[in-house]
């Protein structure tokens, strides 16, 4: 952590190199929050008994998006939103397909586990090397993301027995996509003093803990995590 903090002091947040990388990373977090906003609205339709809670989560994601848009404006950076839409296209399409088929378990794994863990990992690694304005915004966001992760964990734990097979299939289909996403931004993340290995480690810790909380054994988690290597 100290090493990263020292690196942040050396970063020139106004340099064209940094701002170029930031235009894509900032777009990814903006689009990620927009995806989450829309996904929770869809989940509210699929889970009417949890409608109000899911709409509350969707509104929080929209608020997060506005915060990250302000981070871009603070550095005079225009986010590359087209890049970000393509970046999320794999998970986006899989979520839409699952929702159309009424596969709530798959939708929850994609949004409430994979996307939330991806976001938490990215924010955890970014905070020590962020500019002061973005650090304050991101610290506030990451605290709320844990509550979003918790919703998925609680629901899936309560329905674990009947959900396990679908969870395993959804994991196999979607975890490799995360690895491809991480590979895609490795260069830009490095420019911003965020190392891919640290992002992978934090993601796997968050994701493994979530799977454990749902009810998977340690052996199960190791097996499920190995599917990510397919996309490495």
From Swiss-Prot:
Keywords: Iron, Lyase, Metal-binding, NADP
Domain of life: Bacteria
EC number, as in UniProt: 4.1.99.5
SUPFAM superfamilies listed in its UniProt record: Ferritin-like
Transmembrane portions of the chain: none
Note describing how the cofactor binds: Binds 2 metal cations per subunit. The catalytic dinuclear metal-binding site could be either a di-iron or a manganese-iron cofactor.
HAMAP family: Aldeh_decarbonylase
Protein name per Swiss-Prot or TrEMBL: Aldehyde decarbonylase
Organism this protein belongs to: Nostoc punctiforme (strain ATCC 29133 / PCC 73102)
